[in-house]
């Protein structure tokens, strides 16, 4: 079983261009690019939301002072 040579790819590209035309291929490219961009945006938004909701630790020192109270 032989792999794809450069000629196979060239012939396939020519057939696709003849079938669909360059304008349809350009529109398909725009649609695919927009879908990829939207997917990346949604993944980025989910990562930001997850980082905002993640538990955080706060390091602090508590200072106590003694107070005297008088009960009457």
UniProtKB/Swiss-Prot annotation:
Keywords: Cell inner membrane, Cell membrane, Membrane, Protein transport, Translocation, Transmembrane, Transmembrane helix, Transport. InterPro entries: TatA/B/E, TatA/E. Its main location: membrane. Residues 47-72 are annotated as: Disordered. The chain crosses the membrane at residues 1-21. GO terms for molecular function: protein transmembrane transporter activity. Gene3D superfamilies: 1.20.5.3310. GO terms for biological process: protein transport by the Tat complex. The keyword Transferase does not apply. GO terms for cellular component: TAT protein transport complex. The Tat system comprises two distinct complexes: a TatABC complex, containing multiple copies of TatA, TatB and TatC subunits, and a separate TatA complex, containing only TatA subunits. Substrates initially bind to the TatABC complex, which probably triggers association of the separate TatA complex to form the active translocon. Belongs to the TatA/E family. It is a single-pass membrane protein. Residues 51-72 have a biased composition (Polar residues). This is Sec-independent protein translocase protein TatA. Part of the twin-arginine translocation (Tat) system that transports large folded proteins containing a characteristic twin-arginine motif in their signal peptide across membranes. TatA could form the protein-conducting channel of the Tat system. The keyword Acyltransferase does not apply. It is found in: Cell inner membrane.
